[in-house]
Curated annotation (Swiss-Prot):
Classification lineage: Bacteria, Pseudomonadati, Pseudomonadota, Alphaproteobacteria, Hyphomicrobiales
Name of the protein: GMP synthase [glutamine-hydrolyzing]
Chain sites annotated for binding ATP: S230, G231, G232, V233, D234, S235, S236
PANTHER family assigned to the protein according to its UniProt record, in alphabetical order: GMP SYNTHASE [GLUTAMINE-HYDROLYZING] (PTHR11922:SF2), GMP SYNTHASE-RELATED (PTHR11922)
Organism of derivation: Brucella canis (strain ATCC 23365 / NCTC 10854 / RM-666)
Coiled-coil region: none
Entry annotation: catalytic residues: C86 (nucleophile), H176, E178
InterPro entries registered for this protein in UniProt: Class_I_gatase-like (IPR029062), GATASE (IPR017926), GMP_synth_C (IPR001674), GMP_synth_GATase (IPR004739), GMP_synthase (IPR022955), GMPS_ATP_PPase_dom (IPR025777), NAD/GMP_synthase (IPR022310), Rossmann-like_a/b/a_fold (IPR014729)
Assembly and binders: Homodimer.
Pathway: Purine metabolism; GMP biosynthesis; GMP from XMP (L-Gln route): step 1/1
Keywords annotated in UniProt: ATP-binding, Glutamine amidotransferase, GMP biosynthesis, Ligase, Nucleotide-binding, Purine biosynthesis
CDD domains listed in its UniProt record: GATase1_GMP_Synthase, GMP_synthase_C
Length: 520
């Protein structure tokens, strides 16, 4: 549920599509606020949000199946614009008196749309009589239209590829405008929200900042607030927003578990204390964490140990402050979107994300989540709005367990220091080559393998370092970065020459899938 209220909202009803979040991203990129809700709770959300327009998502289901998801009748009774995408088009037709059938020629992948009529939906992008690339993914198709609808676009296997009831402002598209494979899709969605729904592009990070600050003040009142600062972008932006809202009522706690990148803890402390005058406590708990991890090779046990110790240390520090009433977390919108479950009946699974585990319950604190309505790219824009430097905002993702999961096998302080130095050199080489912003994530891994080498006149038996770099849009899928071999040669030479304990460097050329980005 929203922590703030937006009068000009688009409601996206999720029927279980894998790309529903992309619809929301495109609407947000048009500077319009939107929310995703599962079809099971769409009635309640429609009443609560009173949206200006509705978008119906795709679905893995068939409208011809008994009990298949439906849109609430209330949206068709409200007299507001509706856009149905793929399954959304089909269920809208079926619910309004048209017909949908299964078993016709399927369309998966690239297709070409022939524009039959001009429409506000196509304004500025497609004209009558032209042909355009779109992305299809459907097995069912509309075979007859409800009263009031006309065909405004066709494809070879979808005669009702785009339909419209211009009077009621109901539109249906059989293709997916939200994916990048429909080149003009983002503009089509902009046409729907701006021209057809009539919402002005007022959703900006400047406006969000003002509303979020006001919402935090209203929630917190005169209470005491603490924030677990990790050094990452999300927690940092959340902390700055909270500080702008409540000032000295906020104290940030940064737990240095000894698993951060080179000089990272000190850099974060300097930035927040000196540049932002933020009350910040740095806790050096590295001995405690590394001692508990010593020799542990199971990646899941590493994660659980780190999570448990973090809660213990944070709890101890919070008690030293006399406790707190509120805990700030950098939870993002994808973490809290309700996901649709078709296999478990009508139940809805809530994806939750807590940066600090069970702390709120254990310490009887209320959560303050000022970023829970934002996607990651919006958080970066908000960080810029708050004055965070580009060098910080654009940093590569870093896992919560830190270097512990980039050190397969047993963790020791010595191995962590070797890895930290190698990682710093690798990232330095990437920056010097001007490649940092072209790569989604890059890091070094210290393998639990030693190999024979020759350095000078002597024989060595030292660790192998693996280098990893991937390109990605969202981290869900990734391809390895295709370096020039000269770059890899230079990086490997520097690491071997400057880091005692490594005598061999390899490069990981695994994509995701089948591999994951991190090694553990």
């Amino acid at each position: 549920m929203s922590t703030t209220a937006y009068p000009d909202t688009i409601l996206i009803i999720d029927f279980g599509s894998q790309v529903t979040q992309l619809i929301a991203r495109r609407v947000r990129e048009a500077n319009v606020y939107c929310e995703i809700v599962p079809f099971q709770s769409a009635d309640e959300a429609f009443k609560r949000l009173q949206p200006k327009g509705v978008i119906l998502s795709g679905s893995p289901h068939s409208t011809t199946d008994i009990g298949s998801p439906r849109a609430p009748q209330a949206i068709f009774d409200a007299g507001i614009p509706v856009l149905g995408i793929c399954y959304g088009e089909q269920t809208m037709c079926a619910q309004l008196g048209g017909n949908v059938e299964s078993g016709h020629d399927r369309e998966f992948g690239r297709a070409f749309l022939d524009v039959q009529e001009d429409s506000p939906l196509f304004a500025g992008i497609w004209a009558k009589g032209t042909r355009h690339q779109v992305w299809m993914s459907h097995g069912d198709r509309v075979t007859s239209l409800p009263d009031g609808f006309t065909i405004i676009g066709t494809s070879p296997n979808a005669p009702y590829a785009v339909i419209a009831d211009e009077k009621r402002k109901y539109y249906g598209v059989q293709f997916h405008p939200e994916v990048v494979h429909t080149p003009d899709g983002a503009k089509l969605l902009q046409n729907f929200v701006h021209r057809i729904v009539g919402v002005k592009p007022g959703w900006t990070m400047g406006a969000y900042r003002e509303q979020a600050v006001e919402a935090i003040r209203k929630q917190v009142g005169s209470g005491k607030v603490i924030c677990a600062l990790s050094g990452g972008v999300d927690s940092s932006v959340a902390a700055l927003l909270a500080h702008e809202a409540v000032g000295d009522q906020l104290t940030c706690i940064l737990v240095d578990h000894g698993l951060m990148r080179k000089d990272e803890a000190q850099q974060v402390v300097e930035m927040f204390r000196e540049h932002y005058n933020l009350p910040l406590i740095l806790v050096d708990a590295s001995d405690r964490f590394i001692g508990a991890l010593e020799g542990e090779s199971d990646p899941e046990k590493k994660r659980k140990t780190i999570g448990r110790l973090f809660i213990e240390v944070f709890e101890e520090e919070a008690r030293k402050l006399g406790g707190a009433d509120f805990l700030v977390q950098g939870t993002l919108y994808p973490d809290v979107i309700e996901s649709v479950s078709f296999t478990g009946g009508p139940s809805v699974t809530i994806k939750s994300h807590h940066n600090v585990g069970g702390l709120p319950e254990r310490m009887k604190m209320q959560l303050v989540e000022p970023l829970r309505e934002l996607f990651k790219d919006e958080v970066r824009l908000l960080g810029k709005e708050l004055g965070l430097p580009d060098s910080f905002i654009g940093r590569h993702p870093f896992p919560g367990p830190g270097l512990a999961i980039r050190c397969p096998g047993g963790v020791t302080r010595g191995k962590l220091e070797i890895l930290r130095e190698a990682d710093a050199i690798y990232l330095d080489e990437i920056r010097k080559a001007g490649l940092y912003d072209a790569i989604w994530q890059a890091f070094a891994v210290l393998l639990p393998v030693q190999t024979v080498g020759v350095m000078g006149d002597g024989r060595t038996y030292e660790f192998v370092c693996a280098l990893r770099a991937v390109t990605s849009v969202d981290g869900m899928t990734a391809d390895f970065y295709h370096y020039d071999m000269n770059f890899l040669g230079n990086a490997a030479t520097r690491i071997i020459n400057e880091v005692r304990g490594i005598n061999r460097v390899v490069y990981d050329v695994t994509s995701k899938p089948p591999g994951t980005i991190e090694w553990e």
